Amino acid sequence: RVRASSGRVAGSGRSLDAGRTQHKFDYLRSLGIALFPQDGSGIQPGMTLVTSAAVEESVPDVVSANELGLERLTRPQFLAKLLNQPQPTLAVGGTSGKSTVTGMIGWILHACHRQPTVMNGAVMKNFVTPSAPFASAVVGDPELFVSEVDESDGSIALYRPEIAMLTNISLDHKEMAELRSLFGAFLLRARKAVVNLDDPETRAIADVVPADKCVGYGFDSPGARFMGKNLELMADGSAFTVIAGDESQDVQLSVAGRHNASNALGAIAAACALGVSLEEAAGALARFEGLRRRLETIGTAAGVTVIDDFAHNPDKIDATLATLRAQPGRLLIMFQPHGYGPLAKMGDELAQSFAEGLAADDRLYLPDPVYQGGTVERSRGSDW
């Protein structure tokens, strides 16, 4: 978005120096974004340094920025500057489902010719084109901004959107008590809160949100403003009816799983909060293609279907396994933990999810956790 607004953008990264994912860096260069080694040489006076949570103080670019006295922002602080504007903004939070919901809302608005700006954590297939192969962000009208927001580092406390959406709350990067506090404050800061009432944790938080600003949705929650009924799950999608007041619309999805039906119901509620009609929102989702690495079928050979999925916490794994279990065949699961830190926090719960979700003839393979460098404690690995 900054580059599209005529701002100058440059950057570095460990992956660039290591020669990984060169096609992604080539794409950035094609947008006019300058790239340089992460050795401090690219840092110049007048720059603002924006860093992700993984960038440590010892990184040469950070050292150079400090020596030059440059303004420094974390990625969430920079996103908050864009999101906390007096304009229609919608932020999607929650432990699971926020990337999919953000993609669904973005697509609904686009299909209704609203031209949103969308910031997501995954590639949205509907927006992929030859000139934009990595469509995890869409630059549109700066006056309509939809973004996924993350709670893993506590930075969700920075955001003050017009509309805050909460999908669910479960164990992930932080303890439950802290998550309840972070998400509750997130909803209360917004003018309107869109909340999944089927999730016990989010429902409890919704009870403290003023009734006139809370928009509830759910399949099993009487009193929800957006109610899902007649849910039919199929191998390649689902169908249900959404009821909102005196209106009702049938919804057809081509992404599988009960969790995605819930995601779609929430996306409809959020889009309607932005002024989209129920009919338009439901109709647009029939053409939603999904996200990369979210139960994405890579191909089939010799009777074996290969599926790529990003599930990395107990809740996500439960949903993925439940969706796969509903289809015939044995499961051969290769699961790489999302990092040494998350494995240390959730190892027992992850083991329980697999123990309960896999059948006797299924197989689970565990390589070492993801590690891209840094000083994280690595004494416990996948041999847990």
Short names for language-model regions:
Residues 1-20, 26-34, 49, 67-70, ...:
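ATP-dependent carboxylate-amine ligase
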Residues 34-45:
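Short acidic low-complexity segments
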Residues 12-16, 47-48, 51-54, 75, 163, 192, 195-198, 219, ...:
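Structural motif
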